[in-house]
């Protein structure tokens, strides 16, 4: 199958919003190449691979977002739509250089090339995410999450996902009920299940993500997660203990008025995908919607907020 690869150079603060936009207009897959993230990862004391300074210096500063659309797509119409969407995102985020062109490629060329960069990774002291094609000798007490990301977002390497993993590790209790909004590959749903959640309901607007999530659930032998294409409003309004959303600031603020319909009193809303510059804006909006701030953590340029639901609706 042929694919159209769209290339966009942007900034770290705008890459998630752009990725979300590309998925919403029909991208079959989105890849983010963030040189700043690579530098941070390779400079950690527990980094798995050695990377020389010359390579790090060659990375540049731009974040590159690549999106893949079916080969029969009308490219001029697609490019026009993307430029229009980027202009809108540019009204509230610095999108950087923006659209940089497109190329045609075979599915095999892009669906497998990134695998050499995806290695086992510690999300927390006991949570390990590893690609399905890599071996890993787990130690006592470690929880292994196997992933085959395919064309969906969410491998565990991005700070926004890591922060969610850290917070789920802290707040998920045996028998609790969880909702995962914008589940991507299903990584957070799998983590919640393996940490003891009795049931997880996961949704994503992307059909590819739902397919990949279901495959990853099977890979991890997880049978208490229900995943389907949709948004928060498509989930039945039953009371849960935790709603986790690793999405973007605008969507978090948008759904914050409806999350209390899905949470018990004192239930937790874990919101990630927030760029630092918008932390206070998101926090203020959620406080106005009846939440209480429990905890805020930061990694790189990103923020995750834990909010307590004071008034279940």
Curated annotation (Swiss-Prot):
The keyword S-adenosyl-L-methionine applies. It is an enzyme of class 2 (transferase). One of its GO terms (cellular component) is cytoplasm. Its EC number is 2.1.1.-. It comes from the Bacteria. One of its GO terms (molecular function) is protein-lysine N-methyltransferase activity. Keywords: Cytoplasm, Methyltransferase, S-adenosyl-L-methionine, Transferase. It catalyses: L-lysyl-[protein] + 3 S-adenosyl-L-methionine = N(6),N(6),N(6)-trimethyl-L-lysyl-[protein] + 3 S-adenosyl-L-homocysteine + 3 H(+). SUPFAM superfamilies: S-adenosyl-L-methionine-dependent methyltransferases (SSF53335). It is found in: Cytoplasm. S-adenosyl-L-methionine binds at residues 161, 182, 204, 246. GO terms for biological process: methylation. It holds the Pfam family PrmA. Belongs to the methyltransferase superfamily. PrmA family. PANTHER family: ELECTRON TRANSFER FLAVOPROTEIN BETA SUBUNIT LYSINE METHYLTRANSFERASE (PTHR43648:SF1). Methylates ribosomal protein L11. This is Ribosomal protein L11 methyltransferase. The gene is prmA.
């Amino acid at each position: 199958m042929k694919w159209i690869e769209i290339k966009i150079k942007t900034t770290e603060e705008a890459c998630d919003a752009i990725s979300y936009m590309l998925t919403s207009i029909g991208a079959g897959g989105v890849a983010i190449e963030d040189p700043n993230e690579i530098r941070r990862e390779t400079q950690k004391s527990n980094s798995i691979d050695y990377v020389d300074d010359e390579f790090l210096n060659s990375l540049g500063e731009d974040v590159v977002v690549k999106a893949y659309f079916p080969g029969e797509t009308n490219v001029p119409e697609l490019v026009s739509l993307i430029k229009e969407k980027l202009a809108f995102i540019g009204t509230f985020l610095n999108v950087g250089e923006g659209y940089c062109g497109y190329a045609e490629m075979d599915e095999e060329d892009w669906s497998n090339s990134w695998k050499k960069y995806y290695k086992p990774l510690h999300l927390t002291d006991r949570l390990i995410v590893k690609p399905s094609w890599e071996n890993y000798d787990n130690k006592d007490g470690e929880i292994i999450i196997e992933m085959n990301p395919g064309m969906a977002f969410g491998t565990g390497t991005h700070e926004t996902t890591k922060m969610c993993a850290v917070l789920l590790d802290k707040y998920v209790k045996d028998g609790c009920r969880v909702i995962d909004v914008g589940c991507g590959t299903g990584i957070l749903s799998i983590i919640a299940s393996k940490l003891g959640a009795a049931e997880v309901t996961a949704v994503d607007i992307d059909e590819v993500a739902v397919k990949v999530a279901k495959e990853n659930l099977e890979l991890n032998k997880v049978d208490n997660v229900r995943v389907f294409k949709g948004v928060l409003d498509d989930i039945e309004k039953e009371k849960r203990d935790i709603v986790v959303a690793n999405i973007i600031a605008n969507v978090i603020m948008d759904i914050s008025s409806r999350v209390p319909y899905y949470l018990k009193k004192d239930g937790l809303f874990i919101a990630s995908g927030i760029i630092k510059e918008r932390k206070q804006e998101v926090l203020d909006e959620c406080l106005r919607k009846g939440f209480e701030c429990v905890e805020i953590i930061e990694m790189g340029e990103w923020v995750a907020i834990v909010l307590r639901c004071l008034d279940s609706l």
